[in-house]
Amino acid sequence: MILQCQVASDVGCVRTNNEDIALLAGGLYRDTVDRFVAELQPNSRFVAIVADGMGGYEGGEIASEMAAKSFDAFFTGLPAGLSVDRLVAQVKTWVTEIHAEIIAFGDEHREYAGLGTTLVGMFAYEGKIFRI
């Protein structure tokens, strides 16, 4: 399977900082445009996610970057051969853990209290495609 990807991230006309970040094949993208083509072999791994920092709170850009970097480390460290059920369980555990890390960051840095992010994307693992 060949994946043709393009990432475009821009601060826009309203805000002064970009709270969004994309993770594409191990690279982080904010305030940039790039293209990427990946040829997935049966056991290839690939990840493409977008984390959108929550507007209305300080630190959305911090939360989105924390989530993207954390997912990259999580995904890179996954062992081979996990069953679908085990993989899904590990992803759910990761979601709980990164949520706690982001909340703890806000608790430790009061100026960022309430920070948060959304995260959506897909990843390829062991010949299957998953949505997150």
Regions found by a protein language model. Give the residues of each.
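PP2C/PPM-type serine/threonine phosphatase catalytic domain
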Residues: M1-I132
